[in-house]
Design a protein with these regions (language model features):
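Amphipathic, hydrophobic secondary-structure cores in small proteins
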Residues: 14-65
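Small-residue-biased structural context
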Residues: 1-4, 15-18, 25, 74-76
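Intrinsic-disorder/low-complexity, polar/charged segments enriched in Ser/Thr/Lys/Arg/Asp/Glu/Gln
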Residues: 7-9, 36-40, 70-72
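C-terminal edge-of-domain segments
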Residues: 61-85
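Short, low-complexity, intrinsically disordered N-terminal peptides in bacterial proteins
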Residues: 1-7, 80-85
């Protein structure tokens, strides 16, 4: 069960999607993400190209492996204090 304090604002369940749809849906969801919000991406494989895109566009992410072998990737905007100058 997900903790109520960590309920994401948006969820993209990409387990049944084929590339490049998971990446496209994730980018669309990030555009719609409210300030300070979080996006949960559920995906059956590590989306390596997405990680660089997230970091380069000011997001941080946490990856956890699900019991079914898929990945939960929690994405949020990086805090300004941690930004690179």
């Amino acid at each position: 069960m997900m903790s109520p304090t960590h309920t994401p604002d948006l969820v993209v369940d990409a387990r049944a999607m084929l590339p490049p749809e998971p990446l496209e849906r994730t980018l669309e969801a990030l555009d719609a993400l409210p300030e300070g919000g979080t996006l949960l991406l559920i995906i059956p494989r590590q989306p390596a190209p997405l990680y660089d895109m997230l970091v380069n566009n000011g997001y941080t992410y946490e990856v956890k492996t699900r019991d079914d072998g898929a990945f939960d990737i929690l994405i949020r905007q990086a805090e300004q204090a941690h930004g690179d100058g």
